[in-house]
Amino acid sequence: MRAVVCTRYGPPEVLRVEEIPTPAPRKNEMRIRISATAVTSSDCYLRGLRLSPAYRIMARLAIGWNAPRQPVLGMVLSGEVDSVGPDAKSFDVGERVFGFNRHLFGTYAQYVCWPEDGLLSPRPANLTDEESAAIPYGGLLALHFLRRADVRAGHRVLVFGASGAVGTSAVQLARHLGAEVTGVCSTANVGLVTSLGATRVVDYTVEDFVDRAERYDLVFDAVGKNKSAGPLRRRREVLAPGGACVSVDDGTPNLRREDLVLLGELAARGEIRPVIDRTYALDDIVEAHRYVDMGHKRGNVVITVA
């Protein structure tokens, strides 16, 4: 099968498309023929080990010291169950699915074997594979952190980085939970964030959200503290009494299959929609990583595989 292989950490150019053996599912696995995947910011951080020194050591211990132990990166997919092991009962051959393979990687390829208890769900019938692949990463992370902050109807939520993969999901999911949402983004993305349901949008190139009169029950950093420490340094100044600040890189999120199912149901009903900035072919994976590395993508960057 064709796959993107990463044999050392470094810039996008370390990625190569190669022919490698097609995996066979073990007893408790399913093999999925992948139609689409996505390049997430996490993929790029891991490929380049662009992390703080402490996190870099932890990442090397977890995924490989000099190179990823699993040379095929990629965390999300949409595709079709191609083969099942004898003990895998959750999905049938031919079933269309989408999912998030966070710790095992392997989705930059034509096929991947997926554990029976992995984060996999039936694909929304009204969405394309490209749209479905754009849901799991931002959707699951945003849902985890909004729940962690106990966002409820009537809460006022500020989403910093509202136009990225996590941010676009956070705006929509916070609105679904009944919150009043303020999004922070650049001029070019004001229209997008407004269309996703934000009540107010702050253009950070024009004004500082800290200078506004509003106070919030939650300030959600959907970018990550390493990248947004400067703009968010004064974020506690805008908190309402009892309010909280959370960041997408605050600890290890608890990602659950039932939440992926929920995201699929919300997308099927049109209550949330995946946002796709650009779509690349698998052969253009280096260019896709270069684009994500720039840090200005709107929503998701999707890769077509099949």
What are these regions (language model features)?
Residues 211-219:
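A short acidic, Gly/Pro-enriched loop at the edge of an enzyme's catalytic core
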Residues 21-38, 52-103:
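Glycine-rich beta-strand-centered segment in the early N-terminal region that forms part
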Residues 103-116:
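A structural motif shared across PLP-dependent enzymes of the aminotransferase-like
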Residues 98, 219-220:
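N-terminal Rossmann-like NAD(P) cofactor-binding module of classical short-chain dehydrogenase/reductase
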Residues 93, 132-203:
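Mid-domain Rossmann-like dinucleotide-binding core that forms the NAD(H)/NADP(H) cofactor-binding site
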Residues 271-275, 289-306:
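C-terminal capping/lid region of NAD(P)-dependent oxidoreductase domains
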Residues 221-275, 282, 305-306:
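Glycine-rich phosphate-binding loop and adjacent beta-alpha segment
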Residues 85-87, 181-192, 209, 226-227:
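Short glycine/proline-centered loop/turn elements that form peptide/ligand docking sites
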